[in-house]
Amino acid sequence: MHFIFYLILLVSAADYGNFGTYPKVPKTASINGFADPIYDLLPDCAKECVKFSTSNTPCPYWDTGCFCVMPQWAGLVGQCVAQKCKGEDVASARFLATSLCSVVGANTWMMPASISSMLSTAAGDAKEVTTIEGKTAKSWVTAPGSAAGSVVSETGSASETGSSESAQSTTTGSSSTGSSSTDSSSSSSSSPSSSANFAVLQTGGIGSVILGFMMYLLV
């Protein structure tokens, strides 16, 4: 146990110590680093789902990429979306979350496989989303200086993968019922501030992913 604790400390130091090797994320947030960039774009049914306390993670409240690889937190978010939203609203929320994780370099939205399955069931036959506000996933997700067309997945656990989806996966910019969670372009329609937030988000270090995996082993 002590070995794992010290390993986490070392990984954290390596991840945050060399700031010049990877782009930056804003070190501030009104809700948290995961919610702020996508909140205005999320379908209404999913907005409360990104407001969970982050105290069950070691992440700074502003660290977007860290939340992407914390299954104990992402699982709560995913479960909430699956319970409160349906159809295209679910697809929209998943697209926004996985796209965000791609932008910051985590390249995965890590959660228990059972939660990923719940999301798939809640989405049903809804088409996947590749467009929000008339922008393609590729152009909208890629931040300045990052590789274009990067693929992001929604992973189950270290050993198990739930339903995966790429940042370029399907699109239907349509809204669903008020209590459904999908790729609703309409509920998230005009949000210049959110788009601006995406523009400044950049990739994190591989250490965040390792840190997330270590924390997953502990919970």
From Swiss-Prot:
Region Disordered, residue ranges? 151-194
> Where is the protein situated, by its record's location annotation?
Secreted, Cell wall; Cell membrane
Topology with respect to the bilayer: Lipid-anchor; GPI-anchor
How does the record describe its quaternary structure?
A: Interacts with RBT5.
Residues binding heme are: D63
Species, as recorded:
Candida albicans (strain SC5314 / ATCC MYA-2876) (Yeast)
| Residues where lipid is bound covalently (GPI-anchor amidated serine) | S194
Name the record gives this protein: GPI-anchored hemophore PGA7
What superkingdom does the record give?
Answer: Eukaryota
Q: Where is the composition biased (Low complexity)?
A: 153-194
**What residues does the annotated propeptide cover?**
195-219
Signal sequence span is: 1-13
Q: Which cysteines are joined by disulfide bonds?
A: C45-C85, C49-C80, C59-C66, C68-C101
Quote the PTM field.
The GPI-anchor is attached to the protein in the endoplasmic reticulum and serves to target the protein to the cell surface. There, the glucosamine-inositol phospholipid moiety is cleaved off and the GPI-modified mannoprotein is covalently attached via its lipidless GPI glycan remnant to the 1,6-beta-glucan of the outer cell wall layer.
- Record keywords, A-Z: Cell membrane, Cell wall, Disulfide bond, Glycoprotein, GPI-anchor, Heme, Iron, Lipoprotein, Membrane, Metal-binding, Secreted, Signal
List each copy of the CFEM domain by range.
17-126
**Gene null: resulting phenotype:** Leads to defects in hemoglobin utilization as sole source of iron and decreased virulence on a mouse model of systemic candidiasis.
PROSITE patterns associated with the record? CFEM
Q: Which Pfam families match?
A: CFEM
Query: Has the keyword Aminoacyl-tRNA synthetase been applied to this entry?
Result: no
UniProt effect for mutating D63A: Abolishes heme-binding
Induction (record text): Induced by hypoxia, ketoconazole, fluconazole, nitric oxide, ciclopirox olamine, during cell wall regeneration following protoplasting, during adhesion, and during biofilm formation. Regulated by UPC2, BCR1, HAP43, and RIM101.
The UniProt function text for this chain reads:
GPI-linked hyphal surface heme-binding protein involved in heme-iron utilization. Heme transfer occurs between PGA7, RBT5 and CSA2 supporting a model in which the 3 CFEM proteins cooperate in a heme-acquisition system and form a cross-cell wall heme-transfer cascade. The ability to acquire iron from host tissues is a major virulence factor of pathogenic microorganisms. Required for biofilm formation.
Q: Does the keyword Disulfide bond apply?
A: yes
Its GO CC terms are:
cell surface; extracellular region; plasma membrane; side of membrane
Listed GO molecular functions? heme binding; metal ion binding
Effect upon mutating D63H: Impairs the heme transfer within the CFEM proteins cascade
